[in-house]
Amino acid sequence: MPHRERASIKKELTPPFRVHAPCEQTAPFVLCSPHSGRVYPEHFLAQSRLDPLALRKSEDGYVDELFRHVAEFGAPLIAARFPRAYLDLNREAYELDPELFDTPLPDYANTQSVRVVGGLGTIARIVADGEEIYR
């Protein structure tokens, strides 16, 4: 990936998550919204065969908005800014689909998990209804 493209992605996705923190944490838990991000990087949209509305089928839409007020009750909320269709935070780092790469993956990549085989690895190949993401 060219340096200019990496810089553009970094700019679009900085910060990669938001923390809605309480003034004082009084609740014994942390809430997380890993699939409600709505920042779709330009390079991702350009590589997708789907329009933005179709890509949103994999979002847990607005869960971050529903729960952002938990901070008022003493619990923090961590919310990803990018969508699950771009990168799924509830996957192993190397739960990767070989179909999405031009070069062989390292031996330690988990290429045979049920999720990868189904198109839903760390980098998804499909959206929630089974439509292919990439051209």
PLM regions and their residue ranges:
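N-terminal catalytic or cofactor-binding beta/alpha core of small enzyme domains
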Residues: 2-135
